[in-house]
Amino acid sequence: MPTTQQLLRKGRTTLQKKSKVPALKGSPFRRGVCTVVKTTTPKKPNSALRKIARVRLSSGFEVTAYIPGEGHNLQEHSVVLIRGGRVKDLPGVRYHIVRGSLDTQGVKDRNKSRSKYGTKKPKAGAAAAGAKKK
């Protein structure tokens, strides 16, 4: 416990909050170039082949980012947009790739939660035709 004199001399220091997404440097998004695109397996007890990409950012960092949604068109040298947000069952993956921006296409044939996956609104005729098919 410090004395009153010590507090007058030095004062209390407030703890600085550590950023969960340091590579973004305070920005909501960052542009980057894919260096590696691959799949990896999640931690126990989950089982899958999760799609990830190693991305060199405009801020100079090289990070691992998750590719959300079913299917993607990314390959080496694709230019992508990165946002924060970790993947709970993939250690070390703290960023998400934004679907539907720059070189990343939106998820094909997606009708719900489209804005999260960069999918355009289907045409009224196409939606009716899709409903008739089923």
UniProtKB/Swiss-Prot annotation:
List, alphabetically, the CDD domains matched: Ribosomal_S12
Task: Give the UniProt record's GO annotations in the biological process aspect.
Answer: translation
- Compositional bias of type Basic residues: which residue ranges? 9-20, 113-123
What's an example GO cellular component term for this entry? small ribosomal subunit
Record Pfam families: Ribosom_S12_S23
Q: Which InterPro entries does the UniProt record give? A: NA-bd_OB-fold (IPR012340), Ribosomal_uS12 (IPR006032), Ribosomal_uS12_bac (IPR005679)
Q: Which residues carry this modification: 3-methylthioaspartic acid?
A: 89
Subunit architecture? Part of the 30S ribosomal subunit. Contacts proteins S8 and S17. May interact with IF1 in the 30S initiation complex.
Q: What does this protein do?
A: With S4 and S5 plays an important role in translational accuracy.
Question: What HAMAP family does the database record attribute to this sequence?
Answer: Ribosomal_uS12_B
Record-given protein name? Small ribosomal subunit protein uS12
Write down the species: Deinococcus geothermalis (strain DSM 11300 / CIP 105573 / AG-3a)
